[in-house]
């Protein structure tokens, strides 16, 4: 790893640690660089400000989770494969509540924002388009790309809402009790989008 990449990653990891302790709003650039054991000026070689760092952090987290989830999916049936993909993400987020909170507050932006090639999502300019490239066979050819992206984003936002509900202290169901309901909804969405498209 080059010194430049190492410093950039070191700053990112330091920020993640401090954000989790103090919250992003109460964290200063100086706090981050003290944790990273780097000079204050080094920060501005890689990030324009704290918000720029936070945005890149959210994209890094999202792409890492998505890439790792995709590696675990081996089912031949496209719907069951997608459910396996969602299941991996749920388990990860439930085990990492801070990352769940960070991503849930930025879910729509994270899915749709344009990304650069260095995020590792080959042949896609957003996280959502990367997912569509992997799961395009869930849809009929008559669906437009915009329709496909909307449906995928809908299922992922429902997933995120489910995770947030599960970690509430007064949640009436555990995540293991919620999963079958969520997966049934996903199956219904993808089993029915091919039948009389958008019929009311």
Predicted segments with their positions:
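N-terminal intrinsically disordered/low-complexity leader segments
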Residues: 1-6, 194-200
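Generic hydrophobic, amphipathic alpha-helix propensity
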Residues: 7-15, 32, 57-68
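Helix-turn-helix
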Residues: 10, 18-52, 56
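Alpha-helical DNA-contacting segments of helix-turn-helix folds
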Residues: 47, 53-61, 103, 123
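Hydrophobic alpha-helical connector segments
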Residues: 56, 70-96
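Amphipathic alpha-helical packing segments from all-alpha helical-bundle domains
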Residues: 70, 112-153, 180-183
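Amphipathic alpha-helical segments used for helix-helix packing
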Residues: 94-118, 164-168
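Hydrophobic/aromatic-rich alpha-helical bundle segments in the mid-to-C-terminal region
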Residues: 138-185, 196-200
């Amino acid at each position: 790893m080059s010194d430049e990449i190492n410093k950039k990653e070191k700053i990112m990891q330091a920020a993640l640690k401090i954000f989790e302790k103090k919250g992003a709003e109460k964290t200063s650039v100086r706090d981050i660089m003290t944790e990273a054991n780097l000079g204050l000026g080094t920060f501005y070689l890689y990030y324009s400000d704290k918000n720029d760092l936070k945005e890149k952090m959210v994209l890094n987290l999202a792409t890492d989770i998505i890439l790792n989830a995709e590696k675990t999916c081996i089912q031949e049936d496209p719907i069951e494969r997608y459910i396996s993909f969602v299941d991996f993400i749920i388990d990860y987020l439930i085990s990492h509540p801070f990352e769940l909170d960070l991503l849930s507050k930025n879910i729509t932006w994270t899915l749709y924002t344009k990304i650069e090639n260095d995020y590792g999502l080959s042949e896609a300019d957003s996280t959502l388009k990367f997912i569509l490239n992997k799961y395009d066979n869930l849809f009929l050819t008559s669906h437009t790309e915009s329709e496909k992206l909307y449906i995928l984003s809908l299922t992922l936002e429902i997933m995120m809402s489910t995770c947030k509900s599960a970690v509430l202290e007064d949640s009436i169901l555990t995540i293991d009790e919620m999963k079958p309901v969520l997966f049934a909804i996903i199956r219904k969405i993808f089993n029915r989008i091919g039948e009389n498209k958008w019929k009311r």
